[in-house]
């Protein structure tokens, strides 16, 4: 992974913009998702929101009033940045597979190869946002492995977001003994956020 000089501002400016924009959008009418371009935008923004709000929420809960102070520590910042991108990478996979599986099951959409096209495009676009190249390459390989094994007919209803929930548990820069105590809460926090995304997708789907 490349070396980045990180600060609180660098890490959170784009991240919290996504989070706050998602909150704002909750109060305005949402248009239907009628094209693959709109689906791509949905996958990217919702994956970013879920990964960021669950990671930062967990860190804030565990660190309490010391939360902000830790962001002056370069070693900790690198750990948070590493966690952020790795969790996001798995979240992207989960939501891509879920949406295309749901499309196939409910609308008889058959061109599931477009899932790979959209997923790879999102990752390539993230280069400009400093997503580390080694994570991008590893994520593409992992996606290909999952792609070869996926059952498109059932994925959407078969614990589709467990991998990203486990990713938060794995990558969050919290002491292992504390994470062990928090395991159920951590996993549930991710699944609950995905439940919101699933509901929105089902309501907005206009294919």
Question: How would you describe each model-predicted region?
Answer:
Residues 58-108:
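N-terminal interaction modules that seed assembly of large macromolecular complexes
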Residues 56, 60, 64, 96-104, ...:
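Alpha-helical repeat scaffolds in large eukaryotic proteins
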Residues 2-71:
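Leu/Val/Ala/Ile-rich N-terminal alpha-helices, chiefly Sec-type signal peptides and the beginnings
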Residues 49-52, 61, 113-191, 207:
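Polybasic, proline/glycine-rich intrinsically disordered low-complexity segments
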Residues 189-205:
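Long, hydrophobic alpha-helical segments that serve as membrane-spanning/inserting helices
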Residues 49, 53, 85, 89-93, ...:
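Non-catalytic, well-ordered alpha-helical scaffold segments
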Residues 5, 28-32, 104-107, 129-130, ...:
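Short, flexible coil/linker elements and helix-boundary hinge sites characteristic
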Residues 10, 26-29, 41, 45, ...:
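Alpha-solenoid helical-repeat scaffolds
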């Amino acid at each position: 992974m490349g070396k980045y000089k990180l600060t609180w501002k660098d890490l959170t400016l784009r991240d919290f913009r996504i989070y706050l924009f998602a909150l704002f959008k909750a109060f305005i009418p949402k248009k239907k998702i009628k094209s693959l371009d709109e689906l791509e935008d949905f996958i990217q923004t919702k994956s970013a929101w879920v990964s960021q709000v669950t990671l930062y929420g967990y860190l804030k809960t565990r660190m309490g009033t010391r939360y902000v102070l830790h962001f002056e520590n370069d070693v900790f910042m690198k750990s948070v940045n590493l966690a952020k991108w790795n969790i996001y990478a798995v979240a992207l996979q989960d939501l891509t597979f879920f949406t295309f599986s749901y499309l196939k099951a409910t609308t008889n959409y058959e061109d599931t190869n477009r899932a790979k096209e959209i997923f790879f495009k999102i990752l390539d676009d993230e280069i400009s946002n400093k997503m580390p190249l080694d994570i991008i390459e590893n994520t593409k390989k992992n996606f290909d492995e999952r792609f070869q094994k996926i059952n498109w007919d059932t994925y959407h209803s078969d614990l589709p977001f467990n991998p990203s929930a486990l990713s938060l548990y794995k990558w969050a820069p919290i002491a292992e003994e504390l994470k062990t105590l928090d395991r159920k809460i951590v996993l549930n926090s991710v699944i609950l956020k995905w439940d919101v995304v699933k509901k929105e997708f089902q309501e907005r789907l206009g294919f």
